[in-house]
Amino acid sequence: MKNYLFEVCTNSVESCIAAQEGGANRVELCAGIPEGGTTPSYGEIAMAREVLTTTRLHVIIRPRGGDFLYSPVEVKTMLKDIEMARQLGADGVVFGCLTTNGGIDVPVMKQLMEASKGLSVTFHRAFDVCRDASEALEQIIDLGCDRILTSGQQATAELGIPLLKELRERANGRITLLAGCGVNEKNICRIAKETGIQEFHFSARESIKSGMEYKNEAVSMGGTVHISEYERNVTTVKRVKDTIESITSSL
């Protein structure tokens, strides 16, 4: 029997609780989901650690949205955030840095890896926008990362199945491939079967309505991209369970 592992991308403490109750082995805690995930606050990490008693806690270290080319000040910020995550009891951290020409920024990654000693490290989906996936794979292995979160350089992991399979074969057990982006209860079995990958990253979110009775929908807290203040996406126990059971029930 294959030993599958399930990581839920959580956007709040509430989502962490649902992920744990649904059977997730690990969560990746993120703020700023519309930007692809940014470093969560001190309080969010502390509370997530408090409620996660059986599920491992990984924290994304990403000071902003946008590209993965970081200034010296941003690198210093990331180093401080890694230390904060460690002090608050995180089991792992998630980050990735690129050069101007789309390669892995090995010198910066070495700094972050040194700061992360003793923690599990995932190289995140910066991998999916790097120039050469094969070269990047070898560099990330040499850096000592534990896993790579990737969609196979496609918009979703399902579309990235060919490269995901190739990467797993190239890695040959030297690093874990974590398939993520668009993974759900409808496609997880196909991705597992066709790639041979055994770790999966998914959000299992649903939209819930605000509890506000008074609403002024003419005013938005965001900029040009309108996101309603009166509904939000949260991980639900049901969707976590459904996604996990869709693959474990087929064993």
From Swiss-Prot:
State its location(s).
Answer: Cytoplasm
Q: Which GO terms describe its cellular component?
A: cytoplasm
Q: Which InterPro entries match?
A: CutC-like (IPR005627), CutC-like_dom_sf (IPR036822)
Q: Which GO terms describe its molecular function?
A: copper ion binding
Task: Kindly report the protein's main subcellular placement as a broad class.
Answer: cytoplasm
Write the record's keywords in alphabetical order, separated by commas. Cytoplasm
Keyword GTP-binding listed: no
Q: Which PANTHER family match?
A: COPPER HOMEOSTASIS PROTEIN CUTC, COPPER HOMEOSTASIS PROTEIN CUTC HOMOLOG
The family annotation for this protein states: Belongs to the CutC family.
What is the official name of this protein in its record? Answer: PF03932 family protein CutC
Q: Which gene encodes it?
A: cutC
